[in-house]
Amino acid sequence: MQTLQQVENYTALSERASEYLLAVIRSKPDAVICLATGATPLLTYHYLVEKIHQQQVDVSQLTFVKLDEWVDLPLTMPGTCETFLQQHIVQPLGLREDQLISFRSEEINETECERVTNLIARKGGLDLCVLGLGKNGHLGLNEPGENLQPACHISQLDARTQQHEMLKTAGRPVTRGITLGLKDILNAREGLRKTTLETNSLAHRTTW
């Protein structure tokens, strides 16, 4: 089932998305939720954390999965996906280290893909994948092209992606990323894709 909702602005989109995420967490306290990073989901995560604290929702059984990461950057740098999730999800919710399945950007190779894929499988797979749509159409760091990779892989970044806002503090070119593949994303039981445009905001919810 696919549901496409158009709301009046980014704030309304973020509020609606946070309500949906909270409903998933309430219905399945041990849910495995894959999270995108960057500007699009930022306010959603702020609202979600706020609601969890206000309503005293138990998050001790949750597992979050980092969708992607830049390659060859220390995880502690400000522009990494790791730093983003630590600042906006992990620390505000007081999560344990084992509640985040995360790529280690200093150790990137195909073994890292296998490690993360196996950890997700041991948890029973993804219940929900939160996505943003990149300016060039990428999902995660699956760049548009003729040869899309179904599984977790190391990707060569498109020129536009290399200019991503998160990389402005990198201090050096970043040309590769690691990401869950399109099959990994589609294997999630539900998907929540958020798109913000100059004139409107869209939330696209899919149950596979």
Feature map (PLM): residue ranges:
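A glycine-rich beta-strand to alpha-helix segment
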Residues: 36, 40-44, 119-146
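Class I SAM-dependent methyltransferase SAM-binding "motif I" and its flanking Rossmann-like core
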Residues: 136, 140-182
